[in-house]
């Protein structure tokens, strides 16, 4: 597209002296008008082959994108800042802006410049915003991570009772879900889905009760008018979007759920403007169907990302062997929302077991899956007008792979989940598949405007236009040969120039043959007489010239019509295409978990309705793989049995003591991760595992402060511990590490002691509790379901060897000084720490300042280093003098003991 020359205004106009009033050009007036309607977005304003930004937008975008900031014209006596990005590279720049939290309004030219000129020489090309690009409404391949969903979430709330619900949509795949929530669960439910954007009513956005949750989410939270969330008008909005007369086939939704659905759909309509992404019907999630994992637990267990935000090092990365984008997204969904129904879990485990038993079929199917493109995302791009020929090609390749996979499994006796998936794959639209094969070329361009994507022979007119476009010389030469034969003039030529176009040229001597008869005169039309030649044309040649001139445009027009035809057909089959793509993702996840189990030596867990938790030879899935990559010592497997000690009883609590670096935190985490893997339907890193379904998982492992909210490490620890003690029930699994370490020793011990008693008596849940407060091991005599276990170590020549083995019993020390030495603390600090430890253990916690400075121990180290070194050899040494002055026969027992300590001190100062 091109802009009219007058849009920028004349140089003279835009560089008028500052003293004179400067009138904005028509183009800039149009820009300001459009920008006024999109104040919360950067405006990408189409100018020919560029998107340009002006004023504050230009300043912000140039800084965010690292592009040159220039100027164009003046406004109110000031230069107008301007920057721009090429249209062909716009996706790359959009990606950077969205990642930095910006919203972008894309403003396109909506008419041809020639049309604008018809309205007058100074008319401006019409422009309009065709789309708002926001973090939650992305569809372009470059803007999306193939392994992650891109959810837009809306929160609905009803007036009066304030009931809450969440609806979340991935418009790139059509996924649409809804669930009720509560203020207590809101943060956890939002973080489980992990949306890229959260849309809320402006009234809720400023609600003092909910605002802290929005701050914690840390995502793009977008307030919208409350009218968009009106549950009373929601049914009409849903019916209009899905083009149905009634919602009877959608199931029953509560008022807050309708409010959330309405808000989500309204926001999609607002951002997509004229386009309507095809969505699945909203699927209702029922409370309790998935394992509740609060945000702190999700973060500390590093399920999808590590604490530093990286995918590498997470559980998801460790277990991911998928080969398709859809499979990777389904695996992530299952891992972050494990099931709580043993029957449903068993169905998934049956699928993994089947692929383990049919390894040749598993390998053959995975080989086919590797070629499967992301069909749902390609379909969505086609539906909203952002697709290209390769998106149609992705459907064709996906159909082909689906057909092969269905054939591979046609006669197999499959478990239920895989059988349903095979049925969905087999139901692919065969007629449309054949249509795509006939229509699409083998090599497809990225953009439809490039043409060349329709296979030769599909459309006869297109073939003719291509022949004219690509073979015009051959066609002209053929026509010239016909004319030579007809006239007998061997020297006849068909030539071309910019004035006459194509013409027939003969020498003056041969011109008579072209004009001798009335028939010849009517056939060969005189165009021009030259000194030695005459030029003619024919109706046939004129038509051919017109066809050649228009052939390229006509060929592209035909191809675009074919593209629209195929796109419409694809959208009409959206449900069956998505069902097949979902089935392929199920195959991918099940097969990949089988590959993982075989590769890592995992076992099938037994998951039931009991309160058992018996893990034999369990391992940490992430740490074990890291050790293998480093060719280090193999991971040490450990048992964990929190099962009830009697029929009908509650689960047990293990109180874990042991040294720093002994592996306590790893042991705690691995058991939580094994529970998650089992309930997501995966084999687990253990010799055997029997797990009674866990309904809520709580983990308090690791320490960090919350500076943004003014909370210390200890305060964060107490808040998270309070949440656990207030919410855990008998079917919960609780993992607690070092509760009470962030405060004074006796305060911390008291809190930890009381917390264990509460878990045992009130929550009555299965729990692992690690501590350095060895006094707590006495609780095993008081609490019948509590057992002491410890991490084994071996001491050797003042060093400690960590065996990383869990054994029954209690530790009597933590080996902190040895660990400090291993960490590289200065030797003086280590020695002083050892002395202080000995004195504390001996009960000598009071004395002179240079003997033990409780509050400032490092200053004591400095004092120790600065003292002059005592002489210990020779007759004049301090130690020799002290010994020589002793009168053994005159010493009382008490004086002798005091003297021994004095001599030891002198020796130590040496």
From Swiss-Prot:
<keyword id="KW-0547">Nucleotide-binding</keyword>
<dbReference type="Pfam" id="PF05192">
    <property type="entry name" value="MutS_III"/>
</dbReference>
<dbReference type="InterPro" id="IPR005748">
    <property type="entry name" value="DNA_mismatch_repair_MutS"/>
</dbReference>
<dbReference type="GO" id="GO:0005829">
    <property type="term" value="C:cytosol"/>
</dbReference>
<protein>
    <recommendedName>
        <fullName>DNA mismatch repair protein MutS</fullName>
    </recommendedName>
</protein>
<dbReference type="GO" id="GO:0030983">
    <property type="term" value="F:mismatched DNA binding"/>
</dbReference>
<dbReference type="InterPro" id="IPR045076">
    <property type="entry name" value="MutS"/>
</dbReference>
<keyword id="KW-0227">DNA damage</keyword>
<dbReference type="InterPro" id="IPR017261">
    <property type="entry name" value="DNA_mismatch_repair_MutS/MSH"/>
</dbReference>
<dbReference type="InterPro" id="IPR007861">
    <property type="entry name" value="DNA_mismatch_repair_MutS_clamp"/>
</dbReference>
<dbReference type="Pfam" id="PF05188">
    <property type="entry name" value="MutS_II"/>
</dbReference>
<dbReference type="Pfam" id="PF05190">
    <property type="entry name" value="MutS_IV"/>
</dbReference>
<dbReference type="InterPro" id="IPR027417">
    <property type="entry name" value="P-loop_NTPase"/>
</dbReference>
<dbReference type="InterPro" id="IPR000432">
    <property type="entry name" value="DNA_mismatch_repair_MutS_C"/>
</dbReference>
<dbReference type="InterPro" id="IPR007695">
    <property type="entry name" value="DNA_mismatch_repair_MutS-lik_N"/>
</dbReference>
<dbReference type="InterPro" id="IPR016151">
    <property type="entry name" value="DNA_mismatch_repair_MutS_N"/>
</dbReference>
<comment type="similarity">
    <text>Belongs to the DNA mismatch repair MutS family.</text>
</comment>
<dbReference type="GO" id="GO:0005524">
    <property type="term" value="F:ATP binding"/>
</dbReference>
<dbReference type="Pfam" id="PF00488">
    <property type="entry name" value="MutS_V"/>
</dbReference>
<keyword id="KW-0234">DNA repair</keyword>
<keyword id="KW-0238">DNA-binding</keyword>
<dbReference type="InterPro" id="IPR007860">
    <property type="entry name" value="DNA_mmatch_repair_MutS_con_dom"/>
</dbReference>
<dbReference type="Pfam" id="PF01624">
    <property type="entry name" value="MutS_I"/>
</dbReference>
<comment type="function">
    <text>This protein is involved in the repair of mismatches in DNA. It is possible that it carries out the mismatch recognition step. This protein has a weak ATPase activity.</text>
</comment>
<dbReference type="GO" id="GO:0003684">
    <property type="term" value="F:damaged DNA binding"/>
</dbReference>
<dbReference type="GO" id="GO:0140664">
    <property type="term" value="F:ATP-dependent DNA damage sensor activity"/>
</dbReference>
<dbReference type="InterPro" id="IPR007696">
    <property type="entry name" value="DNA_mismatch_repair_MutS_core"/>
</dbReference>
<feature type="binding site">
    <location>
        <begin position="658"/>
        <end position="665"/>
    </location>
    <ligand>
        <name>ATP</name>
    </ligand>
</feature>
<dbReference type="InterPro" id="IPR036187">
    <property type="entry name" value="DNA_mismatch_repair_MutS_sf"/>
</dbReference>
<dbReference type="GO" id="GO:0006298">
    <property type="term" value="P:mismatch repair"/>
</dbReference>
<dbReference type="InterPro" id="IPR036678">
    <property type="entry name" value="MutS_con_dom_sf"/>
</dbReference>
<keyword id="KW-0067">ATP-binding</keyword>
